[in-house]
Design a protein with these regions (language model features):
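Eukaryotic protein-protein interaction scaffolds centered on beta-propeller repeats
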Residues: 6, 20-35, 47, 55, ...
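Structural motif
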Residues: 96-101, 141-145, 185-187, 224-228, ...
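Repeated scaffold domains used in trafficking and secretory/extracellular systems
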Residues: 75-80, 119-125, 162-169, 204-211, ...
Length: 638
């Protein structure tokens, strides 16, 4: 079925370095990790920032419109907004080796600075006037005061080791800081001297620790129990059994609000009322409502004045008020998921294929026609093969399929033996890499599958014009090389002289193999884009960059080589290197980070992490359009 494209133009904001955000009611694609106010309680309008596992920051305004911008390929575990609302500090992590703290200027959508940590960041906040960012770390030294303007640590701001800190805040003059340590300490520091003024022993192991009523009370959760501590004495003045609570308070709130979830979709907003600045009341029910449950349950929230914004495990965002209401109501998200995420794409003549979860489409920028070719039988990647399509799924053992949509007919080619890492097509030969240890070749015409090479630390593989298989690998595994040649007839393997600790991201044109190599020398890592000529057996450096880019790729559409390394700081852009004159075009990015490029004679198209695409003419850095495919098979243009 052909469908003329209906392009609805939405608002967009363009900033420095060509960055642009998208304004919509689209939710996060994964769980909302944190919600934080982006305005002061005294401000006339209310604004919030939500951050998610999808690496997106979304600034929500009072009209429930969200300004979307993806800053990381990792989860954003914590976020804080500067008092003036301009800067957003974020903690990004992969849950292991990557622990990065960065400051973003929301007006220009640019990263001002970034810092890396060996250990996790346990708390993140701005000082009252925004002069410093307080970062708690999972080390004995504990909290750091980082100058907002420069990203430098203010050495000596705290002279006493704080230990692990999970909550930190300052007073209005920024002369006093209060910090809670899960070890069971609530400490007050004189920031003019850097010394502790007072240290109070309190309940250990509290999560969601927060001060309220102007530093008089400390609240936190432990083992499904809500505790409130009187800060002057350190005495626990109340403990309340609760279910999946989310604390909703700030240091200026007189009362403590918290949201309970019974796990069956019933939520109760409760309040502990400040009685006499020494005690709090028993829990008072403010309102009850039915909401999402299971893997869509509400998991985060923030209160600003009388308004509360909530985030869920599915990425949806909700908004309620703290007004008392005795009626049982139901809440609906302010977000609406209207897009069909594009999983993969490939050129076909003057058009491109686009694969979504349920369908295969064919379309182009110039004609504006969307044609649905058929159902997607549960695959995530595609390869153009004549007038047919090869469908497969990365990191699975799902059968590799040949889809002839003109019939339509789906044929199983073969089933991978282990988890499929990559699949490439060279003429009638499919070359796969399974579990980073085995390379197999499948002859489509003969229906024959055979193992061509096995080893360890394998990264990528291509077949060059000499009909040999070239395997990129780790230098640390035998044979000791980063790229080796395999004779597909005899099985003979010959190491090449390509330098580097590891090679990956290969592309090939006749006898020239292009790829990415990483080399470490004296603790410094450098990433190179290389060209290896199989006939001359010589390597030429195409481009060199400082640092390591483990997710780098190359895509060749001669004379341009597309790659995502050498990115503008924090911008995650794609560049096209002209292989004849070495000139570079750095493409302005969309609201989402780019992950793949594809080209035909007329257009270049980039696939973004959120499933949108960005169109370019291939000769200019300017975005022609950002398109999202709706669930009705129509294009939305930003």
């Amino acid at each position: 079925m052909k469908r003329t494209v209906f392009i609805f133009v939405f608002l967009c904001a363009a900033f420095l370095l060509g960055a642009q955000s998208h304004i919509s009611t689209q939710p996060h694609q994964e769980a909302v990790s944190v919600i934080t106010p982006a305005a002061q309680e005294s401000d006339f309008s209310k604004a919030y920032v939500s951050a998610g596992k999808d690496g997106f920051l979304i600034k929500w305004t009072e009209d429930n419109q969200g300004e979307h911008y993806q800053i990381s390929e990792y989860e954003i575990k914590a976020a804080a907004v500067s008092p003036d609302g301009r800067f957003i500090a974020v903690y990004e992590t992969d849950g292991g080796l990557v622990n990065r703290l960065a400051l973003w200027d929301w007006e220009t959508l640019s990263r001002k600075w970034a810092r890396r940590y060996k250990d996790s960041v346990t708390s993140l906040s701005f000082t009252e006037n925004g002069t410093y960012i307080i970062a708690g770390t999972a080390t004995v030294s504990g909290a750091e005061f980082i100058r907002t303007a420069t990203g430098d640590v203010a050495v000596g701001k705290i002279k006493d080791a704080t230990g692990i800190v999970s909550y930190a805040v300052t007073n209005s003059t920024e002369k006093t800081a209060a910090m809670y340590s899960p070890a069971g300490n609530l400490s007050f520091y004189d920031l003019t001297t850097g010394r502790a003024k007072q240290r109070i022993s309190v309940m250990q192991g509290l999560s969601q620790a927060v001060l309220f009523n102007n530093f008089l009370f400390l609240a936190g959760v432990k083992d499904d129990t809500l505790y409130v501590v009187y800060c002057i004495s350190g005495k626990t003045i109340t403990s309340i059994r609760t279910s999946n609570p989310i604390l909703l308070a700030s240091k200026s709130d007189r009362n403590l609000y918290y949201l309970e979830n019974d796990g069956k979709g019933l939520y109760t907003l409760k309040m502990l009322e400040n009685a006499d600045n020494r005690t709090v009341s028993n829990p008072k029910i403010v309102r009850m409502f039915k909401g999402p449950r299971g893997n869509e349950a509400i998991t985060s929230g923030a209160k600003l004045g009388n308004e509360i914004m909530l985030g869920s495990a599915s990425g949806a965002v909700y908004k309620i008020t703290a007004d008392a209401d005795s009626a049982l109501s139901s809440i609906e998200p302010i977000t609406q998921d209207i897009y069909d995420r594009i999983l993969d794409m490939a050129p076909i003549g003057e058009d491109f294929y686009f694969l979504t979860k349920d369908s295969l489409f064919r379309s182009s920028y110039d004609t504006g026609i969307v044609k649905r070719l058929g159902d997607n039988p549960g695959r995530t990647q595609l390869i153009t093969y004549g007038d047919s399509v090869i469908l497969w799924s990365k990191d699975t053992r799902l059968p590799i399929l040949l889809f002839d949509y003109s019939l339509p007919e789906v044929k199983t080619l073969y089933i991978p033996k282990t988890s499929l890492h990559s699949l490439r097509l060279f003429g009638n030969l499919l070359v796969d890499l399974e579990s980073s240890s085995s390379v197999n070749v499948y002859d489509i015409e003969k229906g024959a599958l055979r193992e061509a090479y096995s080893g360890a630390g394998l990264q990528d593989c291509v077949i060059a014009a000499d009909s040999k298989l070239y395997v990129a690998k780790s230098f640390a595994t035998n044979p000791r090389c980063a790229l080796l040649a395999v004779d597909l007839e005899t099985g003979e393997t010959v190491p090449t002289a390509l330098a580097g600790n590891v090679a990956f991201g290969l592309s090939v044109r006749e006898n020239d193999i292009y790829g990415v190599s990483v080399q470490e020398n004296a603790g410094t890592k450098r990433t190179s884009v290389f060209r290896y000529n199989t006939a001359a057996k010589q390597t030429v450096s195409v481009a060199n960059f400082t640092g390591e880019f483990p997710d780098a790729f190359t895509y060749l559409y001669f004379p341009s080589l597309y790659t995502n390394i050498g990115q503008n700081v924090g911008q995650n852009t794609i560049r096209a290197i002209n292989l004849t004159d070495r000139k570079n075009i750095i493409f302005n990015r969309s609201a989402s980070m780019p992950i793949k490029a594809a080209c035909n004679a007329a257009r270049a198209v980039i696939l973004n992490r959120d499933g949108s695409i960005s169109w370019y003419d291939g000769t200019s850095s300017q975005v022609l359009a950002d398109w999202y495919l709706t669930k009705e098979g129509q294009w939305f243009e930003f």
